[in-house]
Amino acid sequence: APKNNFGYVSIDDEKSRKIVELFEAVEDENIGFLKEIFSKDLKFTDPNGTELNKDEFIAGVENIFDMFDDVEFEDSEYSDYDGLAVETTYYTNGQVWTNIWSRFEGKGKYTGNEVSFPFHISYLWEGDKIIEEVQFFSTKVFDAENEAKNNQLK
């Protein structure tokens, strides 16, 4: 890839492929892959700016598994990968960030709603582990499903 003062972007490197695998693991509800790829020192920031540690993040993913069936990530016209547009930027300052643009699709177990919404997530790498995740999307779907779940559990 051509280099400049900024860095360079790759769509077919190891880290981009790992993020594709990460989303396949979410579709398969394979929490073990997530526990492995995320650093023990993970700093996770949700779309509302709330910061969580790794244990809190994993619990949140397990809650998504509980709230939704048939989770899939929609094909993107911008990508060679099925379902995902993923790119990794290798900055000249040494930071490596992988970004994904996709759609979350699934069926709410508590509302019965078929849901679909676009999202963007950025991942900062430290070696072969993800040390930071920052999410950008509307949480309305998750909030509604969580509310329905809590109401049913009362």
Predicted regions and their residues:
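Short, low-complexity N-terminal intrinsically disordered segments enriched in polar/charged residues
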Residues: 1-32, 36, 153-154
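A short gly/proline-enriched turn/hairpin at secondary-structure junctions
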Residues: 5, 37, 41-53, 67
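Sec-exported extracytoplasmic/periplasmic mature domains
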Residues: 24-28, 39-43, 62-70
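A mature extracytoplasmic/lumenal domain signature
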Residues: 38, 48, 102-104, 121, ...
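Surface-exposed, charged secondary-structure patches
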Residues: 58-111
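Short, surface-exposed coil-to-beta transition loops
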Residues: 114-120
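Short, solvent-exposed coil/turn segments at beta-strand boundaries
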Residues: 123-130
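Low-complexity, intrinsically disordered terminal/linker segments enriched in charged
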Residues: 131-154
